[in-house]
Amino acid sequence: INLKAIAAMAKKLL
């Protein structure tokens, strides 16, 4: 998992 994947997931959760 990279930062972009984390950012995308966080964006969905928020």
Curated annotation (Swiss-Prot):
Tissue expression as described in the entry: Expressed by the venom gland.
Q: Which residues carry this modification: Leucine amide?
A: L14
GO MF annotation list = toxin activity
Protein location: Secreted
A GO CC term attached to the entry: extracellular region
Keywords, A to Z? Amidation, Antibiotic, Antimicrobial, Fungicide, G-protein coupled receptor impairing toxin, Immunity, Innate immunity, Mast cell degranulation, Secreted, Toxin
InterPro entries, sorted: Mastoparan
GO terms for biological process? defense response to bacterium; defense response to fungus; innate immune response; killing of cells of another organism
Q: Name one Pfam family in it.
A: Mastoparan
| Family as reported in the entry's similarity comment | Belongs to the MCD family. Mastoparan subfamily.
Instruction: State the protein's purpose.
Output: Shows mast cell degranulation and antimicrobial activities against the Gram-negative bacteria E.coli ATCC 25922 (MIC=3.0 ug/ml), the Gram-positive bacteria S.aureus ATCC 2592 (MIC=1.5 ug/ml) and the fungus C.albicans ATCC 2002 (MIC=12.0 ug/ml). Its mast cell degranulation activity may be related to the activation of G-protein coupled receptors in mast cells as well as interaction with other proteins located in cell endosomal membranes in the mast cells.
Q: What protein is this chain from? A: Mastoparan-like peptide 12d
This protein's species is Vespa magnifica (Hornet)
